[in-house]
Curated annotation (Swiss-Prot):
2-gamma repeats lie at residues 240-286. It comes from Clostridium botulinum C phage. It is found in: Secreted. The gene is HA-33. This is Main hemagglutinin component type C. Agglutinates human erythrocytes. The hemagglutinin (HA) component of the progenitor toxin protects the structural integrity of botulinum neurotoxin; may increase internalization of the neurotoxin into the bloodstream of the host. The hemagglutinin (HA) component is involved in binding to the upper small intestine through interactions with glycolipids and glycoproteins containing sialic acid moieties. Binds galactose or oligosaccharides with galactose at their non-reducing end. 1-alpha repeats lie at residues 2-55. 1-beta repeats lie at residues 56-100. PROSITE patterns: RICIN_B_LECTIN. The lineage of its organism: Viruses, Duplodnaviria, Heunggongvirae, Uroviricota, Caudoviricetes.
Length: 286
């Protein structure tokens, strides 16, 4: 296997799924049941979450604009659609990725002789496997594509005018209303070795770091390459517009606004995941 790559197929991560020879088109849920290729617009109906089943060793592929709907082979027909999750074998897929070309074959679990295929009219179907290029797909990690090496601001879901900010006279991270300061601007960078992200403050080029003490504060700190400086960034389970940031030192703990307060100067901490709004963040490019 080659070096870890952001587009490796990992459980619970979200991807664009494109023809291998045309990443300007992606799988698109164009109605409550129909799925086909469409021009890439980056909407939630074009983002797909992979859910791995360890017993079947296969994936469900859920669309992010309605996560009760998953990619389904309409057996015994050749067509595919999105349908309500019934846990049927026709709703699971083997994903076979070539780690050099990054091409993926999407093979149905119910009948492994059948693979997903796109047609010249952009419709999708299952067919017996051939060497044809229209049975090869690319998976592109949505968050990596959107955020890696980008300048961003992080807004708490608690209030539309409270942002992740370095304190004026210390390294401590707090909430503060937006005033277009370098203390509020962050460069998000992916690390292939850790398979996680760092967030670097533009003011001091120091990294968002979980300080493991009784307060569980977050500060900016010089790079130590410690897990406390790395974050798994993912969408909410059912919302591709909001994010949770999990600390790599303990992925049950996430970036959190203390006590759901919104006053300027409220501490940002790391706390156990519960998914409430004080752990939800909106990340916008600057």
């Amino acid at each position: 296997m080659s070096q870890t790559n952001a587009n490796d197929l990992r459980n619970n991560e979200v991807f664009f799924i494109s023809p291998s020879n045309n990443t300007n088109k992606v799988l698109d849920k164009i109605s409550q049941s129909e799925v086909k290729l469409w021009n890439k617009l980056s909407g939630a109906n074009q983002k797909w979450r992979l859910i791995y089943d360890t017993n079947k060793q296969a994936y469900k592929i859920k669309v992010m604009d309605n996560t009760s709907l998953i990619l389904t082979w309409n057996a015994p027909l050749s067509s595919v659609s999105v349908k309500t999750d019934t846990n049927g074998d026709n709703q699971y897929w083997y994903l076979l990725q070539n780690y050099i070309s990054r091409n993926v074959i999407i093979r149905n679990y119910m009948n492994p002789n059948l693979v997903l295929q796109y047609n010249i009219d952009d419709t999708l179907m299952v067919s017996t496997q051939t060497s044809s290029s229209n049975q090869f797909f690319k998976f592109s990690n949505c968050i990596y594509e959107a955020l890696n090496n980008r300048n961003c601001k992080l807004q708490t879901q608690l209030n539309s005018d409270r942002f992740l900010s370095k304190n004026l006279n210390s390294q401590i991270i707090v909430l503060w209303q937006w005033f277009d300061s370098s203390r509020q601007k962050w460069i998000i960078e992916y690390n292939e070795t850790k398979s996680a992200y760092t967030l670097k403050c533009q003011e001091n080029n120091r990294y968002l770091t979980w300080i493991q003490n009784s307060n569980n504060y977050v500060e900016t700190y010089q790079s130590t390459d410690s897990l406390i400086q790395y974050w798994n960034i993912n969408y909410l389970d059912n919302d591709a517009s909001k994010y949770i940031l999990y600390n790599l030192q303990d992925t049950n703990r996430v970036l959190d606004v203390y006590n759901s307060q919104i006053a300027n100067g409220t501490h940002v901490i790391v706390d156990s995941y519960h998914g409430n709004t004080n752990q939800q963040w909106i990340i916008n490019l600057i």
